[in-house]
Amino acid sequence: MAKQLLGKEVTDALNAKLIERANALKEKGVVPTLGIVRVGENPSDLSYEKGATKRAELIGINVQKFVLPEDASKEDLLKLIDEINANDAIHGVLMVRPLPKHLKADQNEICNRLDPKKDVDCMTDLSNAGVFEGRSDLGFAPCTPAACMEILDYYGIDCKGKNAVVIGRSLVVGKPAAMMLMGKNATVTVCHTKTVNTAEVCRKADILVSAAGVLNSLTKDYVRPGQVVIDVSINWDENKPNARGGLGAIAGDAVYAEVEPSVKAITPVPGGVGSVTTSVLMKHVIEAAERV
C-alpha cells in the first residue's frame, strides 16, 4: 500500500509558520494584505473567494475585496488595477479567473497591467519569466506547481538526480512544474498529447506529476513500484461515490484503485495538492509584504 501524501499535514505545518511571519510583520507595523479582484457573481468564483478569504483570516492576512459588475469594461478593470498598484497597503493581488467572456480576448493585457511585485498568483509575463529563469525576485510561481514542491519538501522527497516526468504542458501547471523540478536538480521529461508511448515514458519516472486534467487517464500501465505520484488534476467523476451516499465526486487523473497499490507514495484527490494551493497563495502574500 502506498504512502498517502496528505495535503492537510503540509497545510497545517505551512500555516503555522505563516501565522508567525504575519505576527512578526504586524509587530513592525505592517499588516499583510491581499486584494481580491472579482468581476461578476459567478457561484464558483464566489466559492473560491470565500475559501481564500477564510484561509487568509486564519493566518492573519487582511483581505480587501474589489468587485466589478458582470458587464464591466476592460477600461473599468484596468483603472481598478492601476488604483490597486498605487495602493501601498495592498501587498498581493488575486484576480479571480477566468474573466467573463467579453474580457477573455483582453485577459493577457489585463493581467500584465498588475504590478509584478503584487502578482502572488503568477498572472504576469514577468512572473512567468521568473519561474523559467529560476529568479524569485522577478515574481511568484503559480500556486499549484508551488504546492507540489511544498509537498515534496514536507515529505522529504529529494529530487536531486531523480527522473521526473510531468504530464501536461500548460503554462499554469505543467511547464512551471517542470522548471521547478529542474530547479531541484531533477532530470525532467514533459509528456503531452503528441508524446509517443507516454505510458512507457512515465514508467521510467521516479517522480510522476500528472496534470493532464483527464479523468482516469493515469492507469497502472503508467506506473511502477517505487514511484512517487503527484496527482494535480481536479476532475468530476459522476460514478465516484460521495460523502452523501450518492454518486458524483471530485477525482484526479489517476485510477486510484489501480495506481495506489502499485507505487511508493501518492497524493489523493481530494485531500492532496488542492488543499495546499491556497496556503501557498498566502505564503506569497506574506513574502510580498516582507519585501516592502
PLM features per residue range, with description:
Residues 108-119, 124-132, 233-292:
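Rossmann-fold NAD(P)-binding glycine/threonine-rich loop
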Residues 89-90, 205:
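Short, high-confidence coil segments that cap the C-terminus of an alpha-helix
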Residues 76-88:
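Short, well-structured alpha-helical segments in soluble
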Residues 39-53, 136-232, 237-240, 247-260:
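Glycine-rich phosphate/diphosphate-binding loop of Rossmann-like nucleotide-binding domains
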Residues 31-40:
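Short beta-strand segments enriched in small/hydrophobic residues
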Residues 56-70, 188-190:
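Short beta-strand elements in bilobed, periplasmic/extracellular small-molecule ligand-binding domains
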Residues 1-30:
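Positively charged, low-complexity intrinsically disordered leader regions
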Residues 92-159, 216:
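Anion-binding alpha/beta catalytic cores of soluble intermediary-metabolism enzymes, centered on
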